[in-house]
Amino acid sequence: MNSIKFPVLDRTTKNSVISTTLNDLSNWSRLSSLWPLLYGTSCCFIEFASLIGSRFDFDRYGLVPRSSPRQADLILTAGTVTMKMAPSLVRLYEQMPEPKYVIAMGACTITGGMFSTDSYSTVRGVDKLIPVDVYLPGCPPKPEAVIDAITKLRTKIAREIYKDQIRPQQGNRCFTTNHKFLIVRSTDTGNSDQELLYPPSSTSEISTETFFKYKSPVSSHELVNSGGV
């Protein structure tokens, strides 16, 4: 039985009949089935990868690493998030099914870290792009700290209310080269052929109207090697 305390689930009758609610039952079933998305951009991910070994054995918490965002409900943003990587991170988050959770792992993810000083290409805080449930500071955090963050997230899940599990649909955060973040329309348009337009050299901001533009299909090689910051 899970050690997380449930106010209603813990009330039992003399005949050992458990009385509970839909909220507690749903939360209890998800506590031991968090499937994290393997997402790492820097050295913090090495500490997270060490949890898979037998020394820390994070399988005991029911964590099953997934390579597809459509099969994951937890993402640990481990490492530096660059401006060019930001749209991909937002898209991965949008492809995850609800309810979903985010753990910001490391100083570079939370504030930009040492790369945030006079840097034009680093996002200064992943919470400007996606909502964060647990902040895990460190450079890098130890595996024990990651386990503690997961424990705190499990405690938060145990206290959730069913109607609050589905977050309201929000506009995504658009970014500019001078670190001004704007709210734009959703990037999950269902069109796999859309191409990201980077700002021209004559301006420092990405227009909210031309953030995404539908163009003729392009190869992934051309898309990756397109000009930009």
UniProtKB/Swiss-Prot annotation:
Localization per record: Plastid, Chloroplast thylakoid membrane
Enzyme Commission no: 7.1.1.-
Signal peptide span: none
Family according to the record: Belongs to the complex I 20 kDa subunit family.
Record PANTHER family: NADH DEHYDROGENASE (PTHR11995), NADH DEHYDROGENASE [UBIQUINONE] IRON-SULFUR PROTEIN 7, MITOCHONDRIAL (PTHR11995:SF14)
Species per Swiss-Prot/TrEMBL record: Aethionema grandiflorum (Persian stone-cress)
Gene Ontology CC annotations of this record: chloroplast thylakoid membrane; respiratory chain complex I
Protein name, per record: NAD(P)H-quinone oxidoreductase subunit K, chloroplastic
CC cofactor: [4Fe-4S] cluster
Function in brief: NDH shuttles electrons from NAD(P)H:plastoquinone, via FMN and iron-sulfur (Fe-S) centers, to quinones in the photosynthetic chain and possibly in a chloroplast respiratory chain. The immediate electron acceptor for the enzyme in this species is believed to be plastoquinone. Couples the redox reaction to proton translocation, and thus conserves the redox energy in a proton gradient.
Pfam families membership: Oxidored_q6 (PF01058)
Catalytic activity: a plastoquinone + NADH + (n+1) H(+)(in) = a plastoquinol + NAD(+) + n H(+)(out); a plastoquinone + NADPH + (n+1) H(+)(in) = a plastoquinol + NADP(+) + n H(+)(out)
Cofactor binding mode and count: Binds 1 [4Fe-4S] cluster.
Alphabetized NCBIfam families for the sequence: nuoB_fam (TIGR01957), PRK06411.1 (NF005012)
